From Swiss-Prot:
Record-annotated PTS EIIA type-1 domain positions: 506-610
Lineage, top ranks: Bacteria, Bacillati, Bacillota, Bacilli, Bacillales
Task performed by this protein: The phosphoenolpyruvate-dependent sugar phosphotransferase system (sugar PTS), a major carbohydrate active -transport system, catalyzes the phosphorylation of incoming sugar substrates concomitantly with their translocation across the cell membrane. This system is involved in beta-glucoside transport.
A cellular component annotation (GO) from this entry: plasma membrane
Ranges of residues in domain PTS EIIC type-1: 105-476
Key words of the record: Cell membrane, Kinase, Membrane, Phosphotransferase system, Sugar transport, Transferase, Transmembrane, Transmembrane helix, Transport
Main location: membrane
Active site: C26 (phosphocysteine intermediate), H558 (tele-phosphohistidine intermediate)
Localisation: Cell membrane
UniProt-recorded name of the protein: PTS system beta-glucoside-specific EIIBCA component
UniProt membrane topology term: Multi-pass membrane protein
NCBIfam families in the cross-refs: PTBA, PTS-II-ABC-beta
GO biological process: phosphoenolpyruvate-dependent sugar phosphotransferase system; trehalose transport
Amino acid sequence: MKYEQLAKDIIQHVGGKENVISVVHCITRLRFKLKDEGKANTDVLKNMDGIVTVMKSGGQYQVVIGNHVPDVYKDVVEIGGFQNQAETETEDEKKYQGLFNKFIDIIASIFTPVLGVLAATGMIKGLNALFLSTGVLEEANGTYQLLHAIGDSLFYFFPIFLGYTAAKKFGATPFIGMAIGASLVYPTLVVLTEGEPLYTLFTGTIFESPVHITFLGIPVILMSYATSVIPIILAAYFASKVEARLRKIIPDVVKTFLVPFFTLLIVVPLTFIVIGPIATWAGQLLGQFTLWVYNLSPIIAGAFLGGFWQVFVIFGLHWGLIPIAINNLVVQGSDPVLAMVFAASFAQIGAVAAVWLKIKQQKVKTLSVPAFISGIFGVTEPAIYGVTLPLKRPFIISCIAAAVGGAIIGLFRSQGYIIGGLGIFGIPSFLHPADGMDAGFWGIVIAVVVAFVLGFILTYLFGLKSGNASDEQTETKAHTSTGTGEKEEISSPFNGSVITLSEIKDEAFSSGALGEGIAIEPSEGKLFSPVSGMVTALYPTHHALGITTDRGAELLIHIGLDTVQLDGKFFTAHTIQGAQVEKGDLLIEFDIKEIKAAGYAVTTPVIVTNHKQYGQLFLTDKQQVNAGDRLLELTR
């Protein structure tokens, strides 16, 4: 841990971890909620190396660190064991989220922990299918059987794995979730479905179901829950409510075993009798609906999903499609959804390859190599956030190329038959179980090649502005300083009134401890980039951001005072961390009226955090400025 000693000292002098209710951080400071602020040694903390100052505001004990606060926070949380408290704080902050965002968060939290292993077992299953279709192995071969068991294991017992992650997400005991999932795939109950039913319910309807056993005289509809998704998630949610209720009424002395005892006795039978059948029917209807939409126009569906897939990834919306894809595999035996988006990652790396070949900026060129390599294996985040999205045009072009690839996949009606690996390791996922390399498989191959080539050619021809492909010597000159009076101008990011830092009612800024600069009282809720450079920090609540200019100046712009408490309300970001921006680009919009109505000032410090690298810093003498006017001038 990089800041281990500092973290230990901070915990000690805020009164020890037992005095900490919770700790979160904003862009510059740790924000503690303490049981007793009187136990904190404020004077000691203020004089500590690595701490700028200490402040008390809004019921929080704030330890100002600086731009590296996320790293210090990580060590404080780990050493103090505050993870659960931090998670609780995050849940409180989610009160402003909409239902859709909550749904995406739930899906992501449940599936993310198992995706790595799911992809790995899928790769094994895909390679095994490839060996079978090419005649390398036969079904009766022991090697094939063992590889099949490894590859199919997680998917078959999916309810057990999801029982753990879903229970953890919903606040239940994870092992109770696993036990519920294990009950759903218990071999004896699975075998019973192969025998003669006692009778049949809902005869003649789409819900017709044979009954093989009863529970206390109540008919139990045994369904195939192997590989299923929806039943265990709903069961885990129900279990979390039951367990929470039981914990309130069962005495502590017997709580350890009686809570899971009664939870399982209540939840498992109800899952088999009610939750499981309803969830399974819902899954079947969802699968039929997805297939109906797809059949309306596979080409248009492929172009739409393929073209917007990387956009979905950026906003986390792709998590909403993954359960649908898995459900399709369970219900239909194949899935078109993940097939239609498969070419998107290859469109990305095609664009990245063109950027690497043409761009002269060494920083971006260096990023392109690892981004390309990771993209080959389906991990596109480095390509998106490090290369194509900051440059804008390559990202748009990659989406267009992915749309073409998706349309081709729709044309061939390609399907996925397993949840396989990513990138090149995902190709065997599209081998037909019976026909092997059928037309659908070759449709995937053609789409991948077309998406890559199209992304490469269009990016090479149209993807880079002339400034981004300029001579490398220009960039080198911009980053070097001989100490002979080289100047750099920082423009105003707002329209508004200029005030000095010393007038700000926040010691961390007014003292100059975080850096030298100036402050603005914005008259319009729009923040424009004051320089050309990179967004090196963007706090999740969008109230503050850091920008490093092309010439190396590090700026911190903090909209308002203590506005982190608004949890992102009234702020809208038009950029992301890692984005390359030009002077005058709109970065953030904010509602001045609503922020003030909530009781917060919008006075905004604009500071140079690495001001010590400069010999002089000149401030504007204007009292009113417009966005784009000269605000600061730095001289080395």
